Each structure stands twice: as C-alpha cells, then as structure tokens.
Amino acid sequence: MSEIVDIYAREILDSRGNPTLEVDVFLESGAFGRAAVPSGASTGEREALELRDGDMARYLGKGVLKAVDNVNNEIADELIGMDADDQVAIDNKMLELDGTEFKSKLGANATLGVSLAVAKAAADEAGLSLHKYIGGAGARELPLPMMNILNGGAHADNNVDIQEFMIMPAGARCFAEALRMGAEIFHALKSVLKGKGYNTSVGDEGGFAPNLKSNEEALQVIMEAIVKAGYKPGEDVLLALDVASSELFKDGIYTLENEQQKQKTAAQLIDFYEDLVNRYPIISIEDGMAENDWDGWKLLTDRLGKRIQIVGDDLFVTNPRILKEGIQKGIANSILVKLNQIGTLTETLEAIEMAKRAGYTTVISHRSGETEDTTLADLAVAVNAGQIKTGSLCRTDRVAKYNQLLRIEEELDDCALFRGHDVFYNLKK
C-alpha cells in the first residue's frame, strides 16, 4: 500500500520572491506528502547544484521549470511503483539517475523536493508525525534555537560585515520558554535600535539590519536588549555569530570594511574573534574562516575549539565526504546541516550520524530563501540534533518552524527533552 503512484512538481515562490520547487507524492493507499525546497544567498562552492533555467525572460533567469520537468518526467518514471517506505532505495535511485558529484544533471532542488515529499508520504501512510517516522521512539529532544536577530553581510543591505548575530536562550527550561525569551529580546532590540535613531527594517531572515558604527556595536546593542528584556547575558542567553567568511576572503586576506584595520590575515582574524569571545558571552562561531582556507580553520579550531562551538557550513556543505576529511584533520567541532546543500534525506542523515560519532555537535539550519515548509523542525527533533537555526522572531517563513516545534513539544509532553546549556557537550565547562 506504500507504493508510489504519482509524483508531481510545480514552481512556487520562496520568501525572497524567487522561484523554487514544490513536490507532491501520492501513494496507492491515498497517503500524501508535499515538500518545498529552500534556497541560499551565501552558498558554498561545493554545494550540490540548484538547477535554474537561465531564461532571462522569466524571473530574471531564476525559474526552475527545468527542475520541475526533471521531477515530472525522468524522476517520476523511475520512482513510480517503488515503495515510499524504502527511503534509501529511492534516494539511491535518484543518485544513480543523476550520475554526477553535485547533482548537476537533475538538480539538487529536484532530488530534495522528491526525497522529502516521499518521506512525508511514508509518514502519512504509517500514521506518524514526520519526526517520529524519521527518528523513531528516541526522537524527543527539542532544539536550542539560534535566533538571528541582527543581520549583515549578504543577508542585509547595510554596512555590517558579519552576516548574522544570534541569541541562544540556553537558560530556558523548555523550548516554549526559549521561544518566549527570544521574542521578548527581539522586541527589546527594536526598542534599543529606535532609541539610538537606527532603522528597524529587517533582512532576509527577519533580523534587524541597521547601519552600525562597527561589528562590535551589533554585539553591544544585543547585550543591551538582553538586559532590557530582563535576562542575564552569559547565563540566560548566549551569543552566536555567523561570519560567512568566504564572502570576505580574497587572495589570502580577509577584508572587514567596518573595522579600523580592514584587512586581516587568518591569524589576525582569529585574534579578533578571541578578543570578542573574551569580552562577550559568545558560544558559537559559524564559518569563521573561508571554506578553502583549511589552514585557517585548523588555527581557529586549535585556538578556540575547546572554548566555543566552531561550526562548519560552507566548509562542509552537509557532505559526508568533506566532513570525513575535516574530522580526520581536526577541523571545526560542529556541522551546520542544510538539506539542500546535499540534496537527499539519506545523505543528510549520513552526515549527521558521522558528525555525532566524531563528537561534533549538529545544528539543523534553514536557508535565507525559505517557504512555509516546516520539515527542518521535524528533522531537528528526529535526529535529536540539539540545536536549530531558523531565523528571527518575525516573517512567517521563519516563525512557521518555531510554531511547528511548539506543536512537537506539546505532542511529546512529558517525554520532551530540552538541554539548554548542555547541548554544548564537546566543550570544556
């Protein structure tokens, strides 16, 4: 009864007004799954290919009708008749059909849409929530959220170099409380920014995007907002950064336009981070070095990897092969997991399992171009990731994930776990 009888893709819009892919999967029993695919702004060089049409007469070349056609024809022809509950076989069939390292034939947006829609259809067939279907009886840990409340870099039209300044309400007793704390700090930050005469428009991920005097001023206004909301920095709330350093790196030098010393070597940039970590309750730095600066990554990990979470995003691109090399070389201590970087659920789960076996933490993440799809909320609980990064406390495309986590926590009731500070299990206390 779990046999796939139809697969259908369509072109829809993401949160930035760009086309993306949505896929429906129908089973013989009448069970149904639907998934929409996200899209990134700052992307790693080794990410699986997001197939776009390139036809400038439609959506400025960003249409996805080629990917839609690949799903409705080539992929559907191969998968119709297969069992939806055999996720590995289905994903492997698509990998075989594509035959390229980065899914450049079918497009990772095509394969991911199908992969996730199949999982949702199988969950519907089994009468299970998606997190229970993927993770089984042990899926019960609600993630500590990384809330991106101030944006810079490629996520905003301002003069701030660092792409994301995030809060982590680690002192909360449950996810619902963490969400409330984050929302209160978000509104306090708006008040702080207004009081200083700054613009309170928001960026792609719902965080404020003011023109500030320096990158450090972003930390200062967030600290002020935490206190204004009635919380203690370092106890109730921790800070996290996504530097997106690949965007700042050229010819072996990092350029931060908003700093007095604009150009920095890898060692000087690490000195800059260490100084911030010493003065602010920063627990996590993502993409602190450029994706191809592996020597810089090693220096950063050796210097700060026992004290804070060093997260690889563009570095690892959710790719088990690249992650394995990083583990062997002692680079980073955490992986950011983005489903569309690799393009199938099976490969995503493989990367998560590999990271956990190596003692790396895992952070399940959205992209800057999102939809109302809430799959990543279920995935975070399914794999007991412990952390999720899904934007600020406004914009429905971000809040949809938080609201889904509230529902999951309610469903799990007394079985739900929320670890707070303890999610950083690989750091020295």
UniProtKB/Swiss-Prot annotation:
Location of the active site: 205, 338
InterPro entries: Enolase (IPR000941), Enolase-like_C_sf (IPR036849), Enolase-like_N (IPR029017), Enolase_C (IPR020810), Enolase_CS (IPR020809), Enolase_N (IPR020811)
Catalytic activity annotation: (2R)-2-phosphoglycerate = phosphoenolpyruvate + H2O
EC number in record: 4.2.1.11
GO cellular component, one term: extracellular region
Binding site residues for (2R)-2-phosphoglycerate: 163, 338, 367-368, 389
Pfam families: Enolase_C, Enolase_N
Subcellular location: Cytoplasm; Secreted; Cell surface
Positions bound to Mg(2+): 242, 286, 313
Primary localization class, coarse: cytoplasm
Pathway(s) it belongs to: Carbohydrate degradation; glycolysis; pyruvate from D-glyceraldehyde 3-phosphate: step 4/5
Swiss-Prot/TrEMBL cofactor(s): Mg(2+)
Gene3D superfamilies in alphabetical order: Enolase-like C-terminal domain, Enolase-like, N-terminal domain
Thylakoid as UniProt keyword: no
Molecular-function annotations in GO: magnesium ion binding; phosphopyruvate hydratase activity
Cofactor-binding details, from the entry: Binds a second Mg(2+) ion via substrate during catalysis.
Keywords carried by this UniProt record: Cytoplasm, Glycolysis, Lyase, Magnesium, Metal-binding, Secreted
GO biological process: glycolytic process
Keyword Hydrolase: no
Similarity comment text for this entry: Belongs to the enolase family.
Primary role: Catalyzes the reversible conversion of 2-phosphoglycerate (2-PG) into phosphoenolpyruvate (PEP). It is essential for the degradation of carbohydrates via glycolysis.
HAMAP family linked: Enolase
This protein's name: Enolase
Organism name: Pelobacter propionicus (strain DSM 2379 / NBRC 103807 / OttBd1)
